[in-house]
Amino acid sequence: MNPLLAPPYSGTLPFNSMDLSLQSARSAAQPLAKQPPNQQPHQTQQQQQSLIHAPNYPSIQNLTTNATPTSTQLQQQQQQEHLAAMAAAHVSLLQSSRQNQGAPSGNLSNGGDCESLLPPPPPTSVSGNTNHTGSNSSSNSGSNNHIASPHYMQSRDENFKLTQLKRSFEPDLSGKNPQKEKDFGYPSASSASKLPTHNVQQQHANKKPSPLRNYHQQQQPPYNLTPKYNGPQTPPTPQSPLAANPHQMLSPTMDYNQLHLHHQLNSSSGGSYQHMQQDQTQSQSHPQHLHYHNQHATSQTAPPPLLPPLLTSGQFHAQPQDASQQQTASSSQHQTHHSRTAQLTNLDQAVKHKPESEEQPVITDLSYRNSETDKTAANPVPEAPESPYLTTSNEESLESNSNSSNSRKRRKRKASMVMRVTPNENAPEGENSKPQHPQQAANLNNSCSPKKSPKNGGGEFQPFSTQKQSQTENEKTTQENGRGGSPAPAENNSNSNSSTLYNDNENPKTKKQRQALLQRNLTEQHRMQQDDEPPKNHTSPAMPPPSPQSNSSSSSSSSSSANTHSSQSSHAVNNIPKPEINNKATTDTPASPALVEQGDIDAKPAVSVHECDEEEEPAVNKVSPAHPDPPTTAAVAAPPATESPKKSSPAANSESCPFGEVEDKLEQMFAGIEEETERISSPEKPAEESAAMVAHNLTAQLALDPSKTLDTPAENQTSVLAVLAPNQTPTPEIRPVATKAAMKSTMPSPVHSPIPQSRSTSTPLVAGDDSKSNTPVPAKAPAPRRPPPRRLSMGMDASLLRFMIDDPPAKKPGRKKKVTKEPDFEDDDKPSTSAAAAAALAARQLSEAASATKSKPAAGAKKKNAGVKGKKGSAGKGNAKNAKQNGKKSARKPAFTTDEDSTPAPTNGGGSVPELRFKSPFILIKPDGSVSIKNTHSAEDVNEKQTKVKKAPHERKNLRGMHSSTLSNRYDADTTDSTWICVFCKRGPHKLGLGDLFGPYLVTSDCDEYRAAVQTPGAQDIDGMFVNKRRREDMVKGQERNLPAVPATLANIMQAPKISMHKRKRKQTHDSSISYSDDPNESRSQCSSVDLLDCSTESKFVETFRGMGKTSENGFEVWLHEDCAVWSNDIHLIGAHVNGLDAAVWDSTRYQCVLCQQTGASICCFQRCCKAAAHVPCGRSANWSLSEEDRKVYCHLHRHEPGVVEPIKTESIAPVEVSVATPPAPAPPPAFNIHSLP
């Protein structure tokens, strides 16, 4: 396992090696409680390795540990030293990791090296404080991760990758000389080995009596000063904890991480540690984070001592806003969770000594969780958070450095950091609200430590698990952690951090038990992450992180943090939003940073921790109830064992292949450690601890399979995480920064939460990987990067999310695969080309062999394992890498935009075709793991719409009415259109009491009436030529429809007021019998058609078409008054249709009104021989007789002539002309008149 660990660390991203170291730390640290001093040193070395991951935060850890600004300065110096020390310690840790597997003595020697690196603390206080310092580093780092995750975490995640690489390189390059740099001035960060030693000692001390822990917490500020002076090399400090074997025995369940977390809480604040920790630890952790951030930014140069604790806190708070989200996250965490800040500090050391420290924190977490009585386990919680924060800090600095491997790691971390950043923003609400929340924050930060763990391997995972467990204990000791930090330091530590963790770790004192508990915590954390991720939607208001999730690396962090928030909001929606619940709020915020650090795993454990804080162990269970379905799925996946459910938590979190593969690789990386962890893991571990550990520690996750019995409760949490997994789907994208451990726990959860069995498969794979090699973990770590988490944030609320899965288990695994792909491509591509790649390949092959059976239940998970391993295994696996990159990065990130579909074209085949037919937007998860969002209709639907038969083009479709009726809203009564007139009377609407104009009606010129109107019997040819020539060319202007067919010569007349025009024409009519007629002999009764056809008068033709609008070649638009239409001869109403309009219109054009001299006369006198024709309004104004009873019309000359009336009655058919011709013979019978008719 150490060989695997070493290649990933050196060749792969520092996070890979750290993961391996973390795994080693887990293996060694869990037995720490049970092992004799020799084993304890071995554990210490492993813890140191875990802390080597934490060293990403070591400077922050030391700063947090050192309460005073002086200690901050010293810590800064130590940070620089710690970078070197971490490198040296890491080298020794890698060796010791192998030795740990091989022999405890080797581990001891490695632990001794680390111890030499650690700053000297007072013997008992020093041992406790040193461990506490380590715990503070991890706790503060983790807490800061949670609190600062919104900003600090984001920067730090990316930098953390680079920083971890840096650290991995530095340890290799610097040997043990860099140990000073490794110790960022934090007591436990003095050296990776020292921190692990402290962790071991702290395990003893913390486990031994909560008072010791409390004492360390109380003395943390002084002790912080102690590490200041000799941070890098203080063998006594590690040995004090080692010497504190009785403590370890007293609190055997407390893992090193737990001790770290607990101690940090105790040391940071002492008696008033909770409140002081808020102030001092917050400031300290800010300095730590600041130092760490600056150190990373400046490589080895630690920033000048940060401001005093409070000032530093503010400064750190400001920084995240500027360039480092990790600082903001740190400040938030410090503000909200001072204990968390301390934890973050511990995590820093844990990061430095990531392999052992990380593992130890997880073990401590397990111990804490198992033994609720052990309240000294608070320290381990702080340690775990520190590790995540260190990761963030290192990532940030690495981000600045932009090393290739570190860059990838940084991206992962950054993505995780983004996740954490968002939760931290939420968390600071709760954390700042309660000073004791900070301790819980520390616990939660321990949970965050897994974020580191993903980079380290399992170490950071374990701190996160520890943190979560610690927070679970915090829940149990909510009173102390929530409010009474200062009164009972021991109580505070054990209650807030240790208590929960020890409850998780209750009975397992052996390394195996501890590892099993750690794995359970990891699973729990995984579940919490998944819970957090879906609650992320719940907590969306408090979580802007979904948008960060959108970013590749930032997305991972955001997704993780969102997951943390989501899970917390799911089961304890108020946890994040509610600072009211100290533990709750604390957990949520730390979880966020953890998520940022580790990816989804961190966030999920934070959720578990959150619930643990709220309800302690019940809280974890609460997480499971919050997502009952996922628990069920976890149970389904639990078949392997409780441990499998535990792993299932990470696997369930990423029910898809990508996560499963990540898990498998992680398991391979941490195979040896996981085996130890599995042995240590015992059913005693509460479910929440197991869940916390799953999320907390990749090692714990890997050990999940062995600790399946313990995972039954954890399985519930895993289920919860799985339920949140759909929301977590975006998390993988954000998790990219997360390490393989983070990837393992975080990446799969979003996709696979829906598919518990897939998770279960993933879990067995994890177990297989566990026994094989640590390299696979790096492959998993990239998974936290997969876009799905961001996709979920971007796309929709997890609760509203619709997943279309052809083969849910297969598709989920496929998703897993995708999740793994992207992270692998980003973070693990380069590692696969290094010595670590060879180790990873070997581990991958072993893992594949071992997990083949387990993978079969979830083909998707196995696919993911294969892809991730291939990418991780070797550069030769370029195809696998590219496939992952395209499928995971291209498909997973674009999955939100359905770009993913294009990448996994093969995956579209299965159930995508039928699923595409769904009308509403949905997420399509294909068996190959490709995930895409479908929000458009299928091609068939589009074609159907396009092929809809268009309405047959109506004759008037393109026509526009020239005029608007007065009934229309568009009618303008003030400026009426002079051309809008009745076709008969040539008057506008409402003239002479005629009312509104009706229309428009269309009349055609293709009729006999038109031809008759334009032609006269004697001049057909001439009239035809004239009409065709004049009307069509000049007057009508053929193609201008919508315009009145009136020549320009009449424009002035048509525009003139109608009444005045009519009056003028009437005068003309009276003066000359026919104004428009050139024939002076033409009588008034003569048909006006003659005048119209007079070639000499153009105005006659103009008047013919007056009131008409040319709409087409043969079509005219006409409007008419009701009375004009009623009195017309040819118009009649049949049903709702007006018939005979064409004939009436064209016939009217043949007759000119005798009163107004305009065409369109529709009534004529019934008197015989009287040809007078007039418009209805004109006739009425001229006192014509219009009888509506018999529809008889007489002009004003004949209305009083009884003879005329009589004959008209008798001879209604006879024209007026005839009647007038025979007035002297009224007596003759009607027949006479009939005969006399023309």
Curated annotation (Swiss-Prot):
Membrane-crossing ranges are none
- What does UniProt give as the signal peptide span? none
* Compositional bias ranges of the Low complexity kind: 35-49, 73-83, 125-145, 272-287, 309-334, 393-406, 549-570, 632-641, 832-860
Q: Where are the zinc fingers (C2HC pre-PHD-type)?
A: 1089-1131
Per UniProt, the PHD-type Zn-finger stretches lie at 1151-1199
The record ties this protein, via Pfam families, to: zf-HC5HC2H (PF13771)
- UniProt modified residues of type Phosphothreonine: T642
- Supply the PROSITE patterns for this chain: EPHD (PS51805)
Task: State what protein this is by name.
Answer: Uncharacterized protein CG5098
Q: Record the organism.
A: Drosophila melanogaster (Fruit fly)
